[in-house]
């Protein structure tokens, strides 16, 4: 569960709201974005600059949930270095407005009282985790995400717990959820889609070189950072699988590759399929195998029944077709995605790739 994934923010009545009812794995339409009573120009400034700023009290900070920012790169770097080492309790934080609400808990804007560093604090209820039997999944998510360092992967700084709750200290992504951005615009143009694809491919290549398979790439699990860059934000279905081939079915139906639907073993190439589905959805506004029934969706996926609308360019269709191959070894490698002519011609990526590997 990413801090903005499958979250329907609700009104803020207490520091810790109650968990929402279970949501199905199949995608559902969201409610309108939460509009906080604390939304002010200061909050907007915060959203634009939080990743690069040291948070300090302002004249408006007497209102709960309201903070202002002043730039201090040195203080930010010091705070980042300290976060993984310190032991925390909930009393170490000023709790701001809620960012979202999910099946197992809630997410809040939070500020470390000691160094004024701002983050997203995900609060998970142990009773709900135990009820659903997903404690092992959370442990795996923490183990994986806390060790990843990439500009297109949401940072997990630390975690702590008390008798009733588990708290995940996450990077705050000021521009919010990519899925809502896609809903707002209907579909993305080629430049934005290609930029996201380059960022995604670079982040996934970083993961795969570390034997991490994500297995649940979709718009709901992606956030946008300070410059609008893509951030992979949910590692709930990821696995750290050195030399293992998996059989577990997971993820969202529209994004499942043929080998998972058919119950076959799978490896990191499931992420290549998901990248192809994602690219199609960026450009078209809906997944490529979307159908009225689950049965029909399954049929279209296993037959790779891929139909392109006429407005797609030849370059984008070529990339998608090379990713959506039935046989996993035939799918375009991530290095090939980043070097694809359509991506190179259209991507406007700002951050340089931080991970270079030899081609496989």
Curated annotation (Swiss-Prot):
GO cellular component annotations of the record: chromatin; chromosome; chromosome passenger complex; chromosome, centromeric region; cytoplasm; kinetochore; midbody; nucleus
Segments forming domain Protein kinase: 93-343
Active site: 216 (proton acceptor)
Reaction it catalyzes: L-seryl-[protein] + ATP = O-phospho-L-seryl-[protein] + ADP + H(+); L-threonyl-[protein] + ATP = O-phospho-L-threonyl-[protein] + ADP + H(+)
Broad EC category: transferase
Positions with a binding annotation for ATP: 99-107, 122
Family classification: Belongs to the protein kinase superfamily. Ser/Thr protein kinase family. Aurora subfamily.
Assembly: Component of the chromosomal passenger complex (CPC).
The protein's name in its UniProt record: Aurora kinase B
């Amino acid at each position: 569960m990413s801090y903005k994934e499958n979250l329907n923010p609700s009104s803020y009545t207490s520091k810790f709201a109650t968990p929402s009812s279970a949501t199905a794995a199949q995608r559902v339409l969201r409610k309108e974005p939460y509009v906080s009573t604390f939304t002010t120009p200061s909050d907007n400034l915060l959203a634009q600059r939080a990743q690069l700023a040291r948070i300090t009290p302002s004249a408006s900070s007497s209102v709960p949930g309201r903070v202002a920012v002043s730039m201090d790169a040195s203080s930010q770097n010091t705070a980042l270095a300290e976060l993984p080492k310190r032991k925390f309790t909930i009393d170490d934080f000023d709790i701001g407005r809620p960012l979202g609400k999910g099946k197992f808990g809630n997410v809040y804007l939070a500020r470390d009282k000691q160094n004024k560093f701002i983050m997203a604090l995900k609060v998970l209820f142990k009773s709900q985790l135990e009820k659903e039997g997903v404690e092992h999944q959370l442990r795996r998510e923490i183990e994986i995400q806390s060790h990843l360092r990439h500009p297109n992967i949401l940072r997990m700084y630390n975690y702590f717990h008390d008798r009733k709750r588990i708290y995940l200290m996450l990077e705050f992504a000021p521009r919010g959820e990519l899925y809502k951005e896609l809903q707002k615009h209907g579909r993305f143009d080629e430049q934005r889609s290609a930029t996201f694809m380059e960022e995604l491919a670079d982040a996934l290549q970083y993961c795969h070189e570390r034997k991490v398979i994500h297995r649940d790439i979709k718009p709901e699990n992606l956030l946008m950072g300070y410059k609008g860059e893509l951030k992979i934000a949910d590692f709930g279905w990821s696995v750290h699988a050195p030399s293992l081939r998996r059989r577990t079915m997971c993820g969202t139906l529209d994004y499942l590759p043929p080998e998972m639907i058919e119950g076959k073993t799978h490896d990191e190439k499931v992420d290549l399929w998901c990248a192809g589905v994602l690219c199609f959805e960026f450009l078209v506004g809906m997944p490529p195998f979307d159908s009225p029934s689950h049965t029909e969706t399954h049929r279209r996926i296993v037959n790779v029944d891929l139909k392109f609308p006429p407005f797609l360019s030849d370059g984008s269709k070529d990339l998608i077709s090379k990713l959506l191959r039935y046989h996993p070894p035939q799918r375009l490698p991530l290095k090939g995605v980043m070097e694809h002519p359509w991506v190179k011609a259209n991507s406007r990526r700002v951050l340089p790739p931080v991970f270079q590997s030899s081609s496989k």
